[in-house]
Amino acid sequence: MYVKELFVDNFRNLQKQKIEFCEGINIFYGLNAQGKSNLLESIRLLSMGRSFRGSKTTELIKFGEDYFYVKAIICQENNDKKIEFGYKKNENKVIKVNGNKIKSTSELLGQLLTVIFSPEDLNIIKEGPSHRRKYLDSCISVVEKNYLYNLMQYNKILMNRNKLLKSIKEGKSKSILEIFDDQLVEYGAKIIVMRQNYLKNVEINIKKFLLEISNETAEIVYLNSVGLKDASDEEIVKKRLKEKLSKNIDVDLRYFTTQVGPHREDFKIIINGYDSRVYSSQGQQRTAALCLKLSEFEILKKETSEKPVLLLDDVMSELDENRKKYVLERLKGFQTFITHTTKRYLKGDCYFKISNGVVIKE
């Protein structure tokens, strides 16, 4: 799988243009704030249906305009696939695959497989549990077909349960709560099991990568909501989650929120026996984040039997020569997009200069 060409119109600061890419390593260079990251963002948008920077869809429109449109031609097994994403202010976004409009962003997942590496990856390690849950959910959604559906159903039931908790406090009967609990357990257990299985694979990869890069040990600790060391048996997880919800009802009623479930979970990356978020140096944390992203790439490649497209947004300047060489070696043979302020010291198959939103192929 690789991106043959990209067409952008009114996307961020990028000028209206069509760009053709190489199958191998594509280097995009230029001064800061010229549009390098925006180019990668447009490709990632066609892959995941949202900005990797956390921007709202309306913020992707060029200043002074009222719409944007992005289109890519993807080559997959010698067949071309067209993916389009359009959005006009105050209207619904329109996403098409081969000319057919899709109903939801979830249908887009898997059409263009990408892995994004950026300096913000460090936040997965350094920030709070919500960052790690969001990252985990994003990764699993691409390789597990039903994960996003289960997550959406769980969140909808959770929201209704929390509303009910407030109503019970105001005098409504508790009897309906059991119905919500049964539904919450049904979807929650599936989420927990899929997270457990995914993190097992992450641990295998991270152990290998960290040992090869810096000769350090690593493990993943999944802080699941049911208190199990191994939460891979769905029936056991269901039973434990149901027990936890019942036991916690008084606390839930006190705070009007559900205190137990996948929405409160976390995972730790342990380096040399210590929690990397708390005790590791920034250099170690950056290496841990790099290994996490390399693991995402390996799992995606294995589970889909496809070649993901790699997007490296200004990460080369963050890596020393040893880590830079290691990353490029692992990504050899895959279409890769690299942004940097200079093309020096970077070996690519195609070079593009970006200035004021104009992409010029050399």
UniProtKB/Swiss-Prot annotation:
Keywords: ATP-binding, Cytoplasm, DNA damage, DNA repair, DNA replication, DNA-binding, Nucleotide-binding, SOS response. GO terms for biological process: DNA replication; DNA synthesis involved in DNA repair; double-strand break repair; SOS response. Its main location: cytoplasm. It comes from the Bacteria. Signal peptide: none annotated. The RecF protein is involved in DNA metabolism; it is required for DNA replication and normal SOS inducibility. RecF binds preferentially to single-stranded, linear DNA. It also seems to bind ATP. Belongs to the RecF family. NCBIfam families: recf. This is DNA replication and repair protein RecF.
